[in-house]
Amino acid sequence: MGMFKQMMSGKMPMVPQAAINMSDVRDIAKIHVLALENEKANGKRFIVTTEEPFAFQEVAKILKSNGYDKVSTRLAPNFLLNFIGNFDREAKSMRSFIGKTYNGDVSLTMKTFDWNPIPFKKTVLDTAKSIESYLNKVD
């Protein structure tokens, strides 16, 4: 959520050349409840995430095209992210994602619970609205 806040406020002049799988907290909550109610879930682990990783630049483009004008879609050079990671905790945590792709196998979750993840774009925009709402209450 911190990265979203930085992107939305314009405090992130460039986005990392990295991609991650995202999880919508509403999906996580839903699967937790369904797992408690479904005996087929006993003793199993369920992955709740997007099937494919999404690039941070894609997140930035979604935000930018939906009125979040302070968001930058420029890519940060990897060497810069590595350097900044020596001083910034969030940049440091992003280093492990550079140049790697992680795919989440959600087939068991989808099959067991007849579940489809909330669309990525909706998750991004709803997250932004939630952060905006919170920040307006704090101010």
Outline where the language-model segments fall.
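Glycine/proline-rich active-site loop of Rossmann-fold NAD(P)-dependent oxidoreductases
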Residues: 1-2, 35-46
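An acidic site on a long C-lobe helix of protein kinase domains
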Residues: 24-28, 55, 119-120
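Hydrophobic "lid"/C-terminal helical patch
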Residues: 32-36, 63, 124-131
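Terminal hydrophobic/aromatic helix or amphipathic segment near a protein terminus
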Residues: 46, 51-103, 136-137
